Amino acid sequence: TYEISGMKVGGMPGLAPTVMVGSMFYNGHTVVKNATKGLFNKIEAEKQLRKAEESSDMTGLPTMVDLIAENSQAAANYLDFMVDITELPLLLDIVSESAQIESLDYIYEQGMMDRIIFNSLNPHSKETIYKKLKEVQCNNAILLLHSTKYILSSNKDALLQEMIPKAQEAGISNILVDTVVIDIPTL
């Protein structure tokens, strides 16, 4: 079991409650007005966040927010807002490696790193991202087990065993895993 920003995560089933993760600021999210600039309706975003927190209180299941951003400028706007209004852990979810690096620098400079879970490292993540994670002392990351080499769930363990040492070398001590289940019949 890990503790991330005061929240217990993972461990043996039944010892800590399952954590709910809700996404915000994704492409098409109703609160986003301009995804490139990170402009959004703050009142509506806070309402949606409070609803998630209420659900967490009602169910006893802790909540995290997957903060999705198109670039580092948008990420900075979303992060500043979220850090001001909630104590919840935040998943940093940005596709572009350059934007990930810029955002990690911003998070480090603003003193937010203890609240952040990097989402995510995958088999194609470059060495530059691992170096940056170590440099900014990010302890929390998700390993995304998505690879054309390891499609079946039966061989995801081999991929995980390849990725764990790299993450640990980068200073990631709290490793979460996204196994990426693909429902082939629906494709």
Predicted features along the sequence, with ranges:
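Active-site beta->alpha loop and helix N-cap motifs at the rims of alpha/beta catalytic domains
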Residues: 2-155
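Catalytic alpha/beta core domains of metabolic enzymes, predominantly
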Residues: 133-187
